[in-house]
Structures are given as structure tokens and as C-alpha cells.
């Protein structure tokens, strides 16, 4: 009863014991350090190889092989050393464009690597030339010969015989142009212009049309393919009319005697041109009864180009131009190039003889320098000037607006008033 109760202490957590490196953190850190050293070594080798000459690259590879084979890295395992050195050779060979099988044969790092095909052939020297020889196509295939090695033509132009071998950048000097400047293989950049025989072959390759001349020579048989209007062929009686294919294809000039009358094919198909007196106007068109009996008084516009009504020209020979026959559907009669005083066609609506805007009844007609705006009789119907008359009607300038404040424009020689070309704005 008198014994005292024993008080037990609460258990305290103990620190965990030191376990070994189960996660392998220290081992991974060691591998990272090894890889960093290897990367630094590769960077130094690359920096050295970039500055090396192409001739000394093979010697550099041999030195690297000896260095890697003799001085081993103590941190790299022995089993992985050969594999990584061979992988280093493969990477360097890809950068330097070197046959990998040749390197494998030299270093003997892989037992499966065989002697490459480029060392077995007898023409291994052709791979070093800029253009592969035709007999080296078997041994120079693959990485030893570039695909576009045949882009350069030989001086004897033997490869220019086939179009597939002669590329567009052919720069052969071709002493014998018969083999180089062929139609199927000669290129524009081929320098074959110094030999006379080359011009013949080039002329046969690139034929120039006979009408690439300043004037067409009608004595040649291919004259009618020319489209120059200044061509006048043999047998053409009308000097103003070109032969078929050389100017006016719609005009047949065979036996045309009268220039004022249209020949066969030029407007009057049923009217003969011999004398131009035996043909009546009714033969040209039935509704041309109002024309005179002379065939030449009825214009070729009676053939239907004027449309509804017949063009009535009382006397065709009073027109100064030789052919007053070009009519259009827009105009009733168009005397192209004729003077209105000589040509008696009733051009009362619209006419080509008045070279202004008066005959078109536009509001700007009174600003033009024509006889219509000067109060003289013209081809227009009525009086076209609705604005005031010019201050100097006797002057030939035809000025409408004149003001003393105007400083630009022309001055009349008599009154010396300045002309406001765009209207008086005062």
C-alpha cells in the first residue's frame, strides 16, 4: 500500500538512421560531371577543326584517333569507350562529308564494317574531280559524288549531246560547234558566238522570222506573212492598198484600176472596176435608187455599213481624198480626212471634218477655237454658242472671256485684252 507508483516517460521519436544512397543521387551527379567533361572536350575539338584546312583534316582525324586510343579517360568505362569514340568519328564524318565506311575501315571499331565500294574501283580518282567522268558512274555514286556533278560541260562538249547531261548553266567553250550547239541541247548561256560555224547552228536552233525587219521585202516568198502596212507587193495596181496579209486584208488589189471605186472584196462585190461606167447603182444595192446611174457615185457604204439609209454622194470625185468610203454604224456618213467644203456628203448630224466639240453639241464647244464659235457658218445645225460673243470677233484666237484683271492666257494683237481661258472669275 505504501509503494509509490512508477511514472513511465512518453516515448520520444528518434532520428532516422543513415541509410545508403538508394536514389542514386550521388551517382547521377558523378555521371553529369563526366558528361560535362566530355562535352567540353568535344567543343575544343570542334573549335580546332573549324580552323583547320581541308587538306589537313585527314591528318587531324588520325591524330584524334591516336589521342583517344592512347590517353583514356579514367572516368569513362572501358566498355563504353570504343562505342563513344566511334560515335564521335561518325559525327565528325557527317560534318566533314567523309565516307563513314572508310573511317570504320580505318579505325576498325565495328566488326560489321566492310571495305567501302569506293576503294575497290579502279577509278577512285574521279571522285576528286569537279565533274565525274562517264565511266565512273558506278563507283562515284552515293556520298562520294554529288548529284549535280554533271552540271559542268567538258571543253570538248561531249556531254552536250544528251540534253539530260547539259544543264542550263552550261559554260562550254565548244571548239567544235556541231557537237555542242545542237538543237536539243544548246542553251542560251553557251558561249558559242566566236566561231562562224556556230552562227549557222544557232540560226537553225533559233529561227528568226523573215519579217523582223524595218521594211518588208515583197520579193521574198514569205512576204505575205508580214503585217507591216507599208508593204507593197508585186502585181498590186493600187499603191495605197497593201497586198493580202501586209496591210489591208479586206482589199484585193488584183487588177484594180480606179482608186475611187472599191475593187472586188472591198465593198462592192457585184460591181466591176473596169471603167466603172457600165455598172448601175441598183446592182450595188436595191434601195439605192436615188443615186445616179454612175457606179462610182454610189459609195461602198451602200453595202450595208451605214445601216438604214443609203449614203447619197452626188459627186464622189469632188472629194479631195481618194476614198471617202469609211462609214460606221454610229455616223451616217464619215468623210475621214476630207474637207467639209470639198466633200458634199450631207454630214449634218455628226462629222469627222470638224475637229472640235462643236459638231458633237457639247457645252464646251463655245470655248474651242473653231469657226462655229466665231459666228461663221459651220457644219453644226443652228447656232451652238449660247454664251456671249468674244470681245474681238475679228481675232483668230476665238477668245470668249476677256477681262482687264486677267494676267494669263493669250493677248489679241489688236485690242490687247487678256483672255481668260477658264472663264472670268472676277
UniProtKB/Swiss-Prot annotation:
GO terms for biological process: floral organ structural organization; G protein-coupled receptor signaling pathway; regulation of seed development. Keywords: Cell membrane, Membrane, Nucleus. InterPro entries: GG3-like (IPR055305). The keyword Nucleus applies. It comes from the Eukaryota. The keyword RNA-binding does not apply. Guanine nucleotide-binding proteins (G proteins) are involved as a modulator or transducer in various transmembrane signaling systems. The beta and gamma chains are required for the GTPase activity, for replacement of GDP by GTP, and for G protein-effector interaction. Involved in the regulation of plant architecture, panicle erectness, panicle and grain length, grain weight, and grain yield. Involved in the regulation of grain size. This is Guanine nucleotide-binding protein subunit gamma 4.
Amino acid at each position: 500500500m505504501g509503494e509509490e507508483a512508477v511514472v513511465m516517460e512518453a516515448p520520444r521519436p528518434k532520428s532516422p538512421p543513415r541509410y545508403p544512397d538508394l536514389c542514386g543521387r550521388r551517382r547521377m551527379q558523378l555521371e553529369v560531371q563526366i558528361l560535362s567533361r566530355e562535352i567540353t572536350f568535344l567543343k575544343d575539338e570542334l573549335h580546332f577543326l573549324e580552323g583547320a584546312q581541308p587538306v589537313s583534316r585527314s591528318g587531324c582525324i588520325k591524330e584524334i584517333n591516336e589521342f583517344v586510343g592512347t590517353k583514356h579517360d579514367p572516368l569513362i568505362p572501358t566498355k563504353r569507350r570504343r562505342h563513344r569514340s566511334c560515335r564521335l568519328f561518325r559525327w565528325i564524318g557527317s560534318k566533314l562529308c567523309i565516307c563513314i565506311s572508310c573511317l570504320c575501315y580505318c579505325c576498325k571499331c565495328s566488326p560489321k564494317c566492310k571495305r567501302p565500294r569506293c576503294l575497290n574501283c579502279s577509278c577512285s580518282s574521279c571522285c576528286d574531280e569537279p565533274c565525274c567522268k562517264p565511266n565512273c558512274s558506278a563507283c562515284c555514286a552515293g556520298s562520294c559524288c554529288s548529284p549535280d556533278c554533271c552540271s559542268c560541260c567538258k571543253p570538248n562538249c561531249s556531254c552536250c549531246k544528251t540534253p539530260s547531261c547539259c544543264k542550263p548553266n552550261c559554260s562550254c567553250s565548244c571548239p567544235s560547234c556541231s557537237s555542242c550547239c545542237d538543237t536539243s541541247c544548246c542553251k542560251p548561256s553557251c558561249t558559242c558566238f566566236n566561231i562562224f560555224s556556230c552562227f549557222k547552228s544557232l540560226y537553225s536552233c533559233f529561227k528568226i522570222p523573215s519579217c523582223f525587219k524595218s521594211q518588208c521585202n515583197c520579193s521574198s516568198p514569205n512576204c505575205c506573212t508580214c503585217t507591216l502596212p507599208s508593204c507593197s507587193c508585186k502585181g498590186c495596181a493600187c499603191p495605197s492598198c497593201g497586198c493580202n496579209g501586209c496591210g489591208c486584208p479586206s482589199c484585193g488589189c488584183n487588177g484594180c484600176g480606179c482608186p475611187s471605186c472599191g475593187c472586188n472584196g472591198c465593198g462592192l462585190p457585184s460591181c466591176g472596176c473596169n471603167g466603172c461606167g457600165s455598172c448601175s447603182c441598183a446592182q450595188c444595192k436595191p434601195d439605192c435608187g436615188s443615186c445616179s446611174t454612175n457606179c462610182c457615185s454610189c459609195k461602198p457604204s451602200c453595202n450595208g455599213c451605214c445601216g438604214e439609209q443609203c449614203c447619197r454622194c452626188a459627186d464622189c470625185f469632188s472629194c479631195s481624198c481618194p476614198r471617202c468610203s469609211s462609214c460606221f454604224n454610229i455616223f451616217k456618213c464619215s468623210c475621214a480626212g476630207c474637207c467639209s467644203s470639198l466633200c458634199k456628203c450631207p454630214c449634218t448630224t455628226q462629222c469627222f471634218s470638224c475637229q472640235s466639240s462643236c459638231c458633237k453639241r457639247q457645252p464646251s464647244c463655245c470655248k474651242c477655237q473653231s469657226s462655229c464659235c466665231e459666228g461663221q457658218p459651220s457644219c453644226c445645225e443652228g447656232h451652238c454658242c449660247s454664251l456671249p460673243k468674244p470681245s474681238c470677233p475679228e481675232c483668230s484666237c476665238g477668245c470668249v472671256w476677256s477681262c482687264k484683271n486677267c494676267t494669263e492666257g493669250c493677248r489679241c494683237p489688236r485690242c490687247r485684252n487678256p483672255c481668260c481661258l477658264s472663264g472670268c472669275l472676277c
